Every structure is written in structure tokens, then in C-alpha cells.
């Protein structure tokens, strides 16, 4: 029987360092 995750109202927020939107991995955007 697969485990079910209980939906909790309280969501734990992960602290993440602020990253500027312009510079992401690699800096330049490729398409």
C-alpha cells in the first residue's frame, strides 16, 4: 500500500538565498 502524504495546512518554507532573476545558471539565456 503506497504511503499517503498528509496535506497539512502549515507549509514549511525553505529558506533559499535570494537569486537575481537576470543571472541564472550560466548567466546567458540560450534557446
Curated annotation (Swiss-Prot):
GO BP terms in the entry: cell differentiation; chromosome condensation; spermatogenesis
Tree of life domain: Eukaryota
GO molecular function: DNA binding
Function: Protamines substitute for histones in the chromatin of sperm during the haploid phase of spermatogenesis. They compact sperm DNA into a highly condensed, stable and inactive complex.
Organism: Oncorhynchus mykiss (Rainbow trout)
Record's keyword terms, sorted: Chromosome, Developmental protein, Differentiation, DNA condensation, DNA-binding, Nucleosome core, Nucleus, Spermatogenesis
Subcellular location, principal: nucleus
Name this protein carries in UniProt: Protamine-1A
Subcellular location as annotated: Nucleus; Chromosome
Stretches the record annotates as Disordered: 1-31
A cellular component annotation (GO) from this entry: nucleosome
Tissue: Testis.
